[in-house]
Amino acid sequence: MKRIAFTAIFTSALVAFFPEFARAQVAEASAATAAPLSAARLAGQGVLRFLGFEIYRARLWVQPGFDADNYAAHPLALELTYHRDFAAEAIAKRSIEEMRRVGRFTPQQATRWQQALAAALPDVKAGDRLLGLYQPGAGAVFKMGGRVVGEVSDAEFSRLFFGIWLSPQTSEPGLRQELIAATRTAGQGQQ
């Protein structure tokens, strides 16, 4: 209880004596909750767990008219907040494995895509927030901390990559349902 009181008093003092601190806190909170696409809304969120351990929290942002059954026809943003540290190479390798569940591609494509994804992504630490942006017929753009950290300019890669979370063939159907929850309740998609 004393710790809570001290924290409240300390924060109040910072705000009173350093108003720019308050503005920075509000700006940071606004940036963290702002929609990453124009006119987008949060469709759903969920946590990926493996053997009971939280791996990341996923949040899906979509525009009006999004149809989960035809996700690849719509712009979207997928935000992952990691609960563990991962090397970019490990993320890329696992992504290719998961993409194989979604669709077919050649070994040459797998090699090219894994290399491109490993180069596009940063290593992540617990607490890092990575945002993937999808535009139909285009590649994937990845942002961290509000800046572009990489991209993979291949439309087929992008469709399969976001299919890891959104395709009916995903290895995590429960997480998919959580991500598209608001699109179902809004009557914009059925799966």
For each predicted feature, which ranges?
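Terminal leader/tail segments of proteins
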Residues: 24-191
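Bacterial N-terminal signal peptides
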Residues: 7-17
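Sec/Tat signal peptide C-region and signal peptidase I cleavage site
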Residues: 18-24
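Positively charged n-region of N-terminal signal peptides that target proteins for export
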Residues: 1-3
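General helical structural elements
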Residues: 6-7, 180
